[in-house]
């Protein structure tokens, strides 16, 4: 919690924003909204932070929370006391530097069947005959660094 000053209001707003944006989680945003938005304020669905989080997650093709390969760092870059009305009301503004890294790698099984013909020097895809029936496709899965296999040059 920050002091009962206009600057304290700016700092509190920055802390609220950072706590929601760093988590990029709809459930976390709901908890913060419940704790820090007064009754009669914007509803959870109308709250700009909820809209920002859901837009990020939708754009990143993630679920209700960012996945473990996604990193979000938030740093306050500026603050402004835009207005005050007595000691208890402040129009506070914050500028945040938000950096996100999304690291996702996918591995796919792919099958290729070709007639191969020895040319006297090497095997090449044969020119004659119909293409053989292809194998069934396989499903996609995430690739981890330990699952990468070396490949030889063609």
Language model: regions and residue ranges:
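Core segments of small alpha/beta cavity-forming domains
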Residues: 1-60
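Soluble periplasmic/extracytoplasmic beta-strand elements of cell-envelope proteins
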Residues: 12, 91-93, 124
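Surface-exposed, charged secondary-structure patches
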Residues: 59-100
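Short coil-to-beta-strand transition motifs
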Residues: 71-73, 108-111
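Hydrophobic/aromatic beta-strand elements that line small-molecule binding cavities or substrate pockets
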Residues: 78-81, 111-117
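Short, cysteine-centered beta-strand-loop-beta hairpins and adjacent loop/turn segments enriched
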Residues: 98-109
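Low-complexity, intrinsically disordered terminal/linker segments enriched in charged
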Residues: 103, 125-154
């Amino acid at each position: 919690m920050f002091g009962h000053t206009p600057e304290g209001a700016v700092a509190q707003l920055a802390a609220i924003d950072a706590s929601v944006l760093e988590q990029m989680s709809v459930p976390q945003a709901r908890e913060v909204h419940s704790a820090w938005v007064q009754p009669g304020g914007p509803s959870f669905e109308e709250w700009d932070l909820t809209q920002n989080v859901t837009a990020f997650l939708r754009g990143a093709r993630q679920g209700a929370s960012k996945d473990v390969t996604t990193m979000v760092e938030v740093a306050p870059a500026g603050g402004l006391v835009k207005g005050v009305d007595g000691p208890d009301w402040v129009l506070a503004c914050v500028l945040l530097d938000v950096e996100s890294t999304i690291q996702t790698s996918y591995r796919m099984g792919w099958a290729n069947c070709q007639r191969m013909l020895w040319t006297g020097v090497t095997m090449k895809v044969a020119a004659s005959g119909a293409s053989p029936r292809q194998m069934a496709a396989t499903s996609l899965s995430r690739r981890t660094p330990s699952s990468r296999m070396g490949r030889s040059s063609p």
